[in-house]
Swiss-Prot record:
Record InterPro entries: ATL1/ATL16-like (IPR044600), Znf_RING (IPR001841), Znf_RING/FYVE/PHD (IPR013083)
Bilayer topology: Single-pass membrane protein
Keywords: Membrane, Metal-binding, Plant defense, Transferase, Transmembrane, Transmembrane helix, Ubl conjugation pathway, Zinc, Zinc-finger
Protein name: RING-H2 finger protein ATL17
Zinc finger (RING-type): 76-118
Species in which this protein is naturally found: Arabidopsis thaliana (Mouse-ear cress)
Subcellular location: Membrane
Length: 235
């Protein structure tokens, strides 16, 4: 009788302990506490990065929005308002996100990343750089033949008249047209928040851990019931 009572007390204590542990695990793994714990931190104000250099801000490409030629409505993520006709905006070189010029310039006074996806705005190499790649083609006049006669004087191929020594002309050809820029803007419009995917991973991991804890509880309860029946049968 004493052995049975002790086994029952042990079973009750173990079940209560497992129940308390399971509740603690659920509270610890909840998204609310996870967000609160992740957002509670302290930073040194002296180590906080400053804004972008004004020369880098001016080098970012600018476009003029047109409601007639635009394929879709564009929205500035800083002021949360849509672009209107003939409004100027800036395109981020890495992520291709678009913002109002005055909104993003004010943002870059104290930040150095995109306000939407947090990608760093890297300075252009070699100073200010155009948003479109350009190809320079040099065209020069052909050199005259081996011998030339000018006013009755014979000249060899080494001496070339001054009129023929002209500077080469450079023609700049843009490699990107307006259609490619609109395609880049359309891809940036379908931007997905980077916090969506980690949430899905967290929920799947949480469900798998919950299943493991429940399975452990069932196995322990079956084992304790087996021990209890064994002790009763021995009597």
């Amino acid at each position: 009788m004493l052995t049975t009572t002790i086994l029952i007390l042990l079973i009750v204590i173990l079940m209560v302990s497992l129940h308390l542990y399971y509740r603690w695990y659920l509270l610890r793994s909840s998204p609310f506490n996870r967000t609160t714990a992740a957002s509670t931190f302290f930073t040194d104000p002296s180590s906080t990065p400053g804004g972008l250099n004004p020369s880098i801000i001016k080098s970012l490409p600018i476009f003029t929005f047109s409601a007639v030629t635009a394929l879709f409505a564009m929205e500035c993520s800083v002021c949360l308002s849509e672009f209107k006709d003939n409004e100027s905006g800036r395109v981020m070189p890495n992520c291709k996100h678009t913002f109002h010029v005055h909104c993003i310039d004010m943002w870059f006074h104290s930040h150095s990343s995109c306000p939407l996806c947090r990608s760093q705005i890297e300075p252009f190499a070699g100073g200010v750089k155009s948003s479109m790649d350009e190809v320079a083609i040099s065209i020069s006049d052909p050199v005259y033949g081996d011998t030339n006669h000018h006013e009755g004087t014979e000249t060899t191929g080494d001496s070339v008249p001054e009129d023929s020594q002209r500077k080469p002309a450079a023609i700049e050809i843009s490699q990107r047209n307006l259609g490619e820029i609109e395609n880049d803007l359309s891809r940036s419009h379908s931007f997905r928040s980077p916090t969506d995917e980690p949430d899905d991973i967290f929920h799947s991991e949480f469900e798998s851990r919950s299943g493991e804890v429940l399975l452990l509880l069932l196995l322990l309860s079956e084992f304790l019931i087996f021990c209890f029946r064994r002790s009763v049968a021995c009597k």
